[in-house]
Amino acid sequence: MSLRLSSGSRRSYARPSTGSLRGASFGAGNACGVAGIGSGFSCAFGGSSTGGNTGVANSCAGFTVNEGGLLSGNEKVTMQNLNDRLASYLDNVQALQEANADLEQKIKGWYEKFGPGSCRGLDHDYSRYFPIIDDLKNQIITSTTSNANAVLQIDNARLTADDFRLKYENELALHQSVEADVNGLRRVLDEITLCRTDLEIQYETLSEELTYLKKNHKEEMQALQCAAGGNVNVEMNAAPGVDLTVLLNNMRAEYEALAEQNRRDAEAWFQEKSASLQQQITEDVGATTSARNELTEMKRTLQTLEIELQSLLATKHSLECSLTETEGNYCTQLAQIQAQISALEEQLHQVRTETEGQKLEYEQLLNVKAHLEKEIETYCLLIGGDEGACKSSSYKSKDYGSGNAGNQIKDPVKAIVVKKVLEEVDQRSKILTTRLHSLEEKSQSN
């Protein structure tokens, strides 16, 4: 919201006279010239104003009076009149200073009420961003909590995977030991198979030898029978010899008994070894079957654990990707919000700078306006009376309105009416309120 002050109309009433106002210009260090009937008058005014106080310094550069001019007659009365007018001028200056101080106080109060610290007036209202910021903070907290839960789940899954890995290593060591035992039993089985093959070969060899002995014995018996059944009769008186038949029969009986004993011993040893080997093979087959079943179950468990591990790794990867994406999105949003805040702060700084510039320009224009009004009033007071009429000029201000001046002739009493219009406008140059202040001063002309 900006404050604009436009000066109203300033009117002066005086009796008609033969004096005229020509070539008057007003400003800091302005010079005015008045030509009257039978008199010459020239005066220069200089004024300045700084800050909130208005100071006016008027210096008369030249004051020339002809014999039939303004100061002809009683010079003492004229000086008294000028002193009275100067006192009135100083009173007006004091009143304007008080009005200026009042305006400064109002401007200060307005800045305290609508200044940058109150989030109103010229300052931007950031209250509509607070819910968005709170929502973003809540989302960040929720995402952080979800991230912490995901990290906790990942740690639990990692610990579970480590536990399963230890179990797998233990089962693998047990499996390797069982395989080593199976390999040892296989070597024992191979040795037993070799021993059985050797025994079978020995049995076959002994069987062939027995068959060969039976065949030789049969041939010898046939030869002896053929020799005994011939027609040759030989009689001789000799000592009785050894009966070969009996001897052969005895040898055959001993040999058969020995072969039968060897066969029985070999068969008994073979049966014993076969029974022990069969029992050991049965036990080994049972252990192998149980080990194979256990190995199958361990493989199934390992596959299940690998599947669970892969699913957990996939979940972890997806959560990490989601976390990265969420962080990127929130970083982008925070960067955008920071950019908006920076832009708004820059706009706020620019608005404050413009406001300060407008304030300084307003003060300067107000000081110039006050100075011009004082010069006009002083000029009117100096040239007032019976010699001439005051004619004020009109001027325009770019930011604070315009003032109109004119003179009217009503009666011998001179009246000065000062009207001030105080307008409050917003940033869109829309007039909100308008206040009118008028100050009327009447004085009897000389």
UniProtKB/Swiss-Prot annotation:
Oligomeric state and partners? Answer: Heterodimer of a type I and a type II keratin. Heterodimer with type II keratin KRT5 leading to the formation of keratin intermediate filament (KIF) network. Interacts with KRT6A to form filaments.
Annotated segments matching region Linker 1: 111-132
**Could you tell me which species this protein originates from?**
Mus musculus (Mouse)
GO cellular component terms given for this protein? cytoplasm; keratin filament
PANTHER family in the record: INTERMEDIATE FILAMENT (PTHR23239), KERATIN, TYPE I CYTOSKELETAL 25 (PTHR23239:SF160)
Give the IF rod domain ranges.
75-390
Q: Which PROSITE patterns match?
A: IF_ROD_2
Identify the keywords attached in UniProt to this record, alphabetized. Coiled coil, Cytoplasm, Intermediate filament, Keratin, Phosphoprotein
Further facts: There are two types of cytoskeletal and microfibrillar keratin: I (acidic; 40-55 kDa) and II (neutral to basic; 56-70 kDa).
Protein name per UniProt: Keratin, type I cytoskeletal 25
Which Gene Ontology molecular-function terms are recorded? protein heterodimerization activity; structural molecule activity
Q: Is the keyword Coiled coil in the record?
A: yes
Region: Linker 12; residue ranges are: 225-247
Which InterPro entries does the record associate with it? IF_rod_dom, Keratin_I
Q: Which residues carry this modification: Phosphoserine?
A: S438
Q: Where is this region: Tail?
A: 387-446
- Note down the stretches annotated as region Coil 1B: 133-224
Which SMART domains does the record cross-reference, listed alphabetically? Filament
Function of the protein: Essential for the proper assembly of type I and type II keratin protein complexes and formation of keratin intermediate filaments in the inner root sheath (irs). Plays a role in the cytoskeleton organization.
Chain segments carrying region Head: 1-74
Task: Give the family this protein belongs to, as stated in its UniProt record.
Answer: Belongs to the intermediate filament family.
**Domain of life the protein comes from:** Eukaryota
> Where, subcellularly, is it found?
Cytoplasm
Gene3D superfamilies membership: 1.20.5.170, Single helix bin (1.20.5.500), Vasodilator-stimulated phosphoprotein (1.20.5.1160)
Q: What are the boundaries of the region Coil 1A?
A: 75-110
Segments of this protein annotated with the region Coil 2: 248-386
The processes (GO biological process) annotated in the record are:
cytoskeleton organization; hair follicle morphogenesis; intermediate filament organization
